């Protein structure tokens, strides 16, 4: 989601769209996601700080891809995302904040993807709630 939202934001910037309008348009569309509603805000603020780094994204997507390969399933998108983040790590360092993957596109397009009025960090101010067990009826694992 982070890579696709980076492409969407950068494309709209290149097309001359207002980034605040772009954010709201994506939020109201079928392209909306948790990643858009959270990480797009810190991208548009410029801080890009979600306390998650490129090497952690690479690790997670690598594990996912490896699990699929173990079952003989050759994925299409995961290997591309792996390559994109490997390139990001090479350019900016493995401990670079993951939303800065957008810099690859910003540099290519010679733009800065920024909006106004977005927070520099995402703060979870919802009250803590007691967790609960999710029970799946008729579960059939392979």
Regions found by a protein language model. Give the residues of each.
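Helical "substrate-binding/catalytic lid" subdomain
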Residues: 1-108
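NAD(P)-dependent dehydrogenase/reductase Rossmann-like domain
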Residues: 90-142
